[in-house]
Amino acid sequence: QLIRAAQQNGIRCIVDSSGEALSAALTLGNIELVKPNQKELSALVNRDLSQPDDVRSAAEELVKSGKARRVVVSLGPQGALAVDETGSVQVVPPPMKSQSTVGAGDSMVGAMTLKLAQGASLREMTQYGVAAGSAATINHGTRLCSLDDTQKIFTYLTNA
């Protein structure tokens, strides 16, 4: 109900959920950005997505069906695969020593939300999201990413 009300008022919706909540949100359609991980996407489309092309195809299906405008599949240490109507991009983070993955997904979604609001391309949005998610993993405990670490990793990714 919340997503429907927001959309009726012209508010773009971003969904980072799983299971029934993710499925229900996508049933409404026109979600601005959805960020499942590979396992969540596999459950959503009800098939194994063990190969990169399978993940890309499943994400493309969500976009082509109108359920989501952008799908960014988080792939853990392999980064993220992003798909929209213009195509797809995979962003792989630099090798880093991970201290904790707590908060990495939230950092990623927050960073991508910022870039969406700024009108960034799919590539830039995904690079910034991967940078923020990676920055969160170098912290101990439950700390989210820092702007300084995010910017450093983003610069690395844009120059790679």
Label each PLM-derived region with a short phrase.
Residues 4-9, 24, 52-160:
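Conserved phosphate-binding/catalytic region of the ribokinase-like
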Residues 1-55:
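Conserved beta-alpha-beta core of the PfkB/ribokinase-like small-molecule kinase fold
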